[in-house]
């Protein structure tokens, strides 16, 4: 550093002040000019020891500055250390980008394949009825048992008996051939053996089935309890008892069989018989295993409107054989009319299918192709929404937390009026959440869906906060248990899904990053566990995955071209000559491409990136580089929109102002084409408001003034620049925006205020220490501590986080309820708030992106294609 003569220290007042060439050192400007005239300094900062007014150093252009990350910290709010900031160089140099950029271009054949897949997936949505699923050998065996209603010695549904005879697997078992789950195979095989024995047919199949049972039953001991199908401990022992009566040669003395029988007896002992008939419970799903204790006249009162018992063909068949109830028979005929010669493990599955299909295409990032289809699916679900919750089917009398939480989250985000009070149905007296009313069963997938749901909370929804805490605890414990499995599904990578959800909850999960992650985790052959293993082809299939990969790579190739163009603009415009600011073109472009990624928003991404680049430059200019005189001149130039004023500006300001002037004029020309009216005055006004906020902060800094918390927030929510960025970019979202629409997202709107507030607060929580070390006196933490000198810094930081979390809940509500604002405009505001949460989740993810995970996000989003 260039040292000043200590004899001059007496001329400097006590305190800590930023000094400028013309304003703050008039008494010895000649001396300074003589020493550093070659450097043409424009900004100086004094540093002196604690409790002393002795000048130690003057830092200006041409002198050595402290690196950004090595800036001194001070314990005092009244006498911070001021140093000139020096930012780390940008990581994304051209050679780095070139080394990562894929040479693959989307071919005409791939584009044609995308069109075909889009058409086929649209047909999937349009053909959704009561649910598509695979055969259940177990349930089909129970339906095949039903004797002819005309009294003849034949099955009522002979086609189901024939299906059993024709669909035994090579190993002698029945069930899904591509996936072996011992519980499922043993249960289905036992059911088929008994049915064939009752009808005295299929001797060969019976023999092979018994052999399979004997050799494979012991494998159940090696499988996790969580893989035990629903109701297994009820129906399996009951069928074993029946098999023994029929004289079937089975290993009844196996240890696991004895254990299952003991579990059944213990469960039935705990079951008050009055509960069975008082209200619908999950026991209705397994009545075929409770035949010796059921009062059939009473149980009929709990029959669903569609004639089934909890949509289970097996349970309904058992009730029909005991009662002859016509509605049971009508239900079974209805199911067989759909599937022909077999039945699934439960049916219908209409709500489950629609919700999970929508969730799947959204998480894979291909939902922008299916907006109408998604709306139709959600309209259907909402028409069957119930304040007590929903189950997997519209006629299902028992709601479950899995379908309810999924429905609450998706419906809310799509603007449907649904209350979080619905989750109270699934909370016990200890505050824990469970899947079904009156039970304690929980699984990873249902708790994951509740957790995802809890993040779309509105202000004051304590049930959502409770759900978040409960499920986070459960899911973190599940991750620690390496042997943990989900109770309701066998998914490709449920662990990866949980890890992503916990690390990147809703407010920092950007669409492109979630798509990239879910493409890796998604299983096109995932199966679910009910009473038997079942598949949902409209939820898990290769078409979704194939389109997701093609679409991701196609969009990524477009983004790479746009980024190259922007980097060329950065250099050719002269902005690359500015040394006082951060070069973060790639990171800034990523912030846009991470959410407004669709091809039709290319201009919006371009404008968003350029305006964001300018907001960073202006922040650095007003924050530490420019003198108050020059900043005032710059602001006046923007206000008058007068290029002639650049002659009075320093060289770096000339570059900054000239490029801003030219770029904004170009944007305004394009904006006029898009909006059908002149928008230059509108854009200039947006910029003026930003510069006024920056100027106020520069004046605070010069005066060493620490404002009140509220005063700080009011100004800093503007100076964070997000409003400027959004209010200009929104002109290019493909919508003609009236003054009324603009007012709903304008400076006076709560929506925009919350975006600025949450962005400012998350920024401050991660940067206030470093900025305090550079001499900044105003941050949310410091201002709150000034008002509350009795609290610690940790307590102040906790308060700021609380304010931010509450504001994020309110932001959710504004995003969902602002239906008068076009979706693309609402997205722009909301996603800009979310990208701030992502960038500052670890620290200053813009300035220090090369040290943080942002670097990997940029790489995955913009450069690494999916295979």
UniProtKB/Swiss-Prot annotation:
Listed under catalytic activity are: (2E,6E,10E)-geranylgeranyl diphosphate = (+)-copalyl diphosphate; (+)-copalyl diphosphate = isopimara-7,15-diene + diphosphate
* Listed GO MF terms: copalyl diphosphate synthase activity; magnesium ion binding; terpene synthase activity
The record, for Pfam families, names:
Terpene_synth (PF01397), Terpene_synth_C (PF03936)
- Which pathway does UniProt place it in? Terpene metabolism; oleoresin biosynthesis
**Residues where Mg(2+) 1 binds:** 619, 623
Q: What does the entry's domain section say?
A: The Asp-Xaa-Asp-Asp (DXDD) motif is important for the catalytic activity in the class II active site relevant for the cyclization of GGPP. The Asp-Asp-Xaa-Xaa-Asp/Glu (DDXXD/E) motif is important for the catalytic activity in the class I active site, presumably through binding to Mg(2+).
Q: What is this protein called?
A: Bifunctional isopimaradiene synthase, chloroplastic
